[in-house]
């Protein structure tokens, strides 16, 4: 093969072929057709000779490779070229490199075969994985069954063990009871023997103890009697001092003015004056009340006020509903009673504080803690407040109030307990620092969500208050407890006409000469629509 290749290299056929092509190109236009054909055939013959030599070299090279070497190269290089050459020769077209060759088809077929093999391999792997998954699931089910069996066995054994333990406990208890009964019997016998011996010894010592106790009891009785006599003597002296102070005060007032005053006309101060102290030592302060701090008293009063709203108000409504069918009238009556009770209690507190100041002045004059002493005395002696007189004043004020429309057979004395509780709460609230008071409320005012909450039967879109159900509790300008109000649209103007025609069951507040009229006129506070003769819009 090397010799043939050497001959081909040494042969100058390829070099002369290039020279012939160049000369033919120069003479192509000048030559005739036959001359051009002859030149072309000569070139083809020369190329055919070169191809023959190359095919010989190819054959020898393939033989040197054996049976299998070089097969892929021939398939990939020679066969596609031959296919394209023969196809182009048969069609009379030049060889085009873009025409798909056998190599491309072979490559495509090979890729298709490899793709199908891969798909088959993947299908086989997937089926194997599924088989493994099914096997694992079966194994899990079997393991669950195998685990449940020992669980059930252990549960059964546990129940059996518990039953055995319970039986053993019962047996142990029975044995312990038997042992205890035996010990008790033996202890009883021993205790009886010891008791008989102790009784003998105690009988001997009891005689001596009885004699000693008789002596001690006689001495204690004598000492207690002496203490009682001393206490009675002190109380008598204090009462004498109180009476003498009251007498001097009354004499001084009668000497100053003979005309009757509005304050003594009411019974709200008669009882408290009769029991007014002349000095801070007239009545010993209650230890339970003295220990209460301002915060504790405030919390207790707030709780009482809340109970009065939640329970006392409902009880009063039940009492009034027996005589009055209209719920609006009942709620108005209770609200007015609460407002009047606060007003009367505040007035009573002012008078009570003035009297305490006068009674404490001789002993505490010039003291820096005089006001503190007055406040402490009032806190410790809240039981001196004449609440029943305040109740009577509240009922009288309600009888002349033109806001309340009611049948003549209803008596406001039904609300005495409720009014008394409100008066006591309001009186005690004045002892706080700062004092608590109810908020001013007027029918037809703009509803304030911070002070009041609407009742269940209200119109929640109405901006004005139709009437109040319960007042709000205030500390200075801060709301401590919200009140309750009813809001309705268009109902306030109708209520104004009905209120102007309502009846009064007692004397008119316009009469200036009556006792009730003087008491009402003497009140000094901001005008309220509840007390005005005409409704306020």
From Swiss-Prot:
Residues 253-287 have a biased composition (Low complexity). Residues 171-221, 249-293 are annotated as: Disordered. One of its GO terms (cellular component) is cytosol. It is found in: Cytoplasm, Cytosol; Mitochondrion outer membrane; Mitochondrion matrix. InterPro entries: MIEAP, MIEAP_C. It comes from the Eukaryota. GO terms for molecular function: cardiolipin binding. Keywords: Coiled coil, Cytoplasm, Lipid-binding, Membrane, Mitochondrion, Mitochondrion outer membrane, Phosphoprotein. The keyword Mitochondrion applies. The modification Phosphoserine is found at residues 85, 127, 154, 157, 286, 508. Residues 1-273 are annotated as: Interaction with YWHAG/14-3-3 protein gamma. Residues 115-253 form a coiled coil. Residues 179-217 have a biased composition (Basic and acidic residues). GO terms for biological process: mitochondrial protein catabolic process; mitophagy by internal vacuole formation. Pfam families: MIEAP. Its main location: cytoplasm. PANTHER family: MITOCHONDRIA-EATING PROTEIN, MITOCHONDRIA-EATING PROTEIN-RELATED. Belongs to the MIEAP family. Key regulator of mitochondrial quality that mediates the repairing or degradation of unhealthy mitochondria in response to mitochondrial damage. Mediator of mitochondrial protein catabolic process (also named MALM) by mediating the degradation of damaged proteins inside mitochondria by promoting the accumulation in the mitochondrial matrix of hydrolases that are characteristic of the lysosomal lumen. Interacts (via coiled-coil domains) with BNIP3L (via BH3 domain). Interacts (via coiled-coil domains) with BNIP3 (via BH3 domain). Interacts with YWHAG/14-3-3 protein gamma; a protein that also plays a role in MALM. This is Mitochondria-eating protein. It comes from Bos taurus. The gene is SPATA18.
